[in-house]
């Protein structure tokens, strides 16, 4: 019973710490940087939508699409080697718009 009570009292503190660590869209502020360059390895599911689309990785193409975190929409244009670049509007929507 005493250990359950201690855990119950610690839970709000743990949740507060997690909220501080992951409560922002700014990747650098979160401190959990992930790969945004396709040439450096495979892209994670998060990087497909959360990498800054303005990172100039590779050539720019108006044939590509990227996900804009601010508008929560897929938009035309992207950099070929940026993980947040999709070959079609449909691919971007399927990966990112929920």
Curated annotation (Swiss-Prot):
Q: In which tissues is it expressed?
A: Expressed in salivary glands.
The signal peptide here is: 1-23
Protein's UniProt keywords contain Transferase: no
Disulfide pattern? 36-51, 43-83, 49-96, 74-92
What is the annotated localization of this protein? Secreted
Could you tell me which InterPro entries the record lists for this protein? Kunitz_BPTI_sf
Going by the UniProt record, its keywords in alphabetical order are:
Calcium-activated potassium channel impairing toxin, Disulfide bond, Ion channel impairing toxin, Potassium channel impairing toxin, Secreted, Signal, Toxin
Name of the molecule in the record: R.appendiculatus Kunitz/BPTI-like protein
Question: Could you tell me which species this protein originates from?
Answer: Rhipicephalus appendiculatus (Brown ear tick)
Organism lineage: Eukaryota, Metazoa, Ecdysozoa, Arthropoda, Chelicerata
């Amino acid at each position: 019973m005493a250990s359950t009570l201690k855990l119950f009292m610690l839970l709000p503190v743990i949740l507060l710490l997690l909220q501080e660590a992951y409560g922002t869209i700014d990747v650098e502020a979160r401190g959990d940087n992930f790969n945004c360059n396709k040439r450096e390895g495979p892209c994670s599911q998060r990087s497909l939508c959360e990498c800054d689309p303005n990172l100039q990785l590779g050539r720019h193409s108006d044939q590509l699409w990227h996900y804009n975190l601010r508008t929560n929409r897929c938009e035309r244009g992207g950099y070929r080697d940026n993980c947040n670049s999709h070959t079609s509007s449909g691919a971007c929507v399927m990966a990112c718009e929920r």
